[in-house]
Amino acid sequence: MKTLVLLSALFLLAFQVQADPIQNTDEETNTEVQPQEEDQAVSVSFGNPEGSDLQEESLRDLGCYCRKRGCTRRERINGTCRKGHLMYTLCCL
């Protein structure tokens, strides 16, 4: 189960690296409209519905958050998350 979560996180990180140039142009246009948008906590699930409860619980135990501007010093990048059409960095303690 941990291997699946790790592989999913690596896949999402690779996806973020490819989508990063597009995200930068979106952030530049959105900064004028929403200059002080706060970080938002979002639940993330992977795979089939049977294992999703365990995976969501693991992310909560790790203390994962979707951050717009990057992780804090105590956190590490663990992938990406999406809310609507915006991509965020998934940061875990």
From Swiss-Prot:
Known function: May have microbicidal activities.
Classification via Pfam families: Defensin_1 (PF00323), Defensin_propep (PF00879)
Superkingdom of this protein's organism: Eukaryota
Signal peptide coordinates: 1-19
Biological process terms in GO annotation: defense response to bacterium
Annotated stretches, region: Disordered: 24-55
Family according to the record: Belongs to the alpha-defensin family.
Disulfide bonds: 64-92, 66-81, 71-91
Any one cellular-component term (Gene Ontology): extracellular space
InterPro entries: Alpha-defensin, Alpha-defensin_C, Alpha-defensin_N, Beta/alpha-defensin_C
Proregion positions: 20-58
Official protein name in the record: Alpha-defensin 26
Subcellular compartments: Secreted
Keywords: Antibiotic, Antimicrobial, Defensin, Disulfide bond, Secreted, Signal
Acidic residues bias spans: 25-40
